[in-house]
Amino acid sequence: MFPTMLKIFPILATLAGHVHGVVVTVPEKTVNVKTGGNATLLCTYTSSQPLGNFFIQWSFYSAKESQLHTIYYYSEGQSYSYGEFKDRITAATSPGNASITISNMQPSDTGSYTCEVFSPQDDAGQSQKSVIVNVLVKPSKPFCKIEGTPEKGHLIYLLCKCDQGLPHPTYRWYKVDENTLTPVTEYFNPDTGILYIGNLTTFETGHYRCIASNIMGNSTCELDLTSMHSDGNIVAGALIGAILAAVIICAIVWVLTKKAKKKKSSSNEMQVMAQKQSNAEYAQVPNEENTPATAVLPSNATNEQPSADEAAAPETPENDEKHEVQKEETAGSSF
């Protein structure tokens, strides 16, 4: 709320009275500072008349956030700092000097800083000037990537990009041959870091190194085009072949096992059926011990035994007559 009022106050002060003869000067239009260093932003002002109750204000416009922030305000001997810049700003105290020094500068502090001086007693004049501040930072480790299919006859390109780096890094690609780096300049854009390879057959496979650099230093990343081109395909092919071979072997073993089980089951069924048939035939043949004695027992006097035919003859009327005749003949002979 208070910073917003500070932004409105200069407008109200201008409407209440005219500012005349206030001239703000910024001798340096651009300031470069290393990360963690201190940035001194020079700003002086002059007036043809006494300023009276004037005030000084510094504003910061972040290009990254696209927002304007009030970071410093001075009026009637009191100074204030705000936001991320609180306790980081030291202001000049001599008359006519509105310079400030900002400590521990970070990449997020890169942007435009505006010095403003207002006096309600004077007419309108040149009351503000801006300075660009660049917080220099070494390129971060680049991200390297291959786009496209790394096979013969295919279009591919190598990417190299840093997330941070100020000034903006420039990129260079090199072919790595043991300890020797050979620059690669064909179809290469040093600003974007993209290396185009129109046909892999015209390019020697191997290791490639990207170097991103600026005045603060450099960072590198590498790509192994050989392993991605050959070893990767070989490993993938071998893996697929091994899987297919395992599937085929398992299928063959399963089929053979199923056939063997089916054959064994059929053989067992035939043996059981043969055994049952044999037992049935054996059960139909009468046993001598179980055969009923239907023949006439022989006389005690003669102790004669009936013949097998007589014993086996069934008891019919004809057989009964034959038995009677035999009995009579036997009785006559005994007399």
Curated annotation (Swiss-Prot):
Record keywords: Disulfide bond, Immunoglobulin domain, Membrane, Repeat, Signal, Transmembrane, Transmembrane helix
Coiled coil, from the record: none
Domain Ig-like V-type: 22-136
Main localisation: membrane
Location relative to the cell: Membrane
GO terms for biological process, alphabetical: epithelial cell morphogenesis; maintenance of gastrointestinal epithelium
Stored PROSITE patterns: IG_LIKE
Membrane topology type: Single-pass type I membrane protein
Superkingdom, natural source: Eukaryota
Biased composition (Polar residues): 268-306
SUPFAM superfamilies in the cross-refs: Immunoglobulin
Disordered as annotated region, ranges: 266-335
Tissue: Expressed in thymocytes.
Domain Ig-like C2-type per the UniProt entry, residue ranges: 139-226
GO cellular component assignments: basolateral plasma membrane
Name listed for the protein in its UniProt record: V-set and immunoglobulin domain-containing protein 1
Organism encoding this protein: Gallus gallus (Chicken)
Keyword DNA damage: no
SS bond partners: C43-C115, C160-C210
Segments traversing the membrane: 234-254
Residue spans, topological domain Extracellular: 22-233
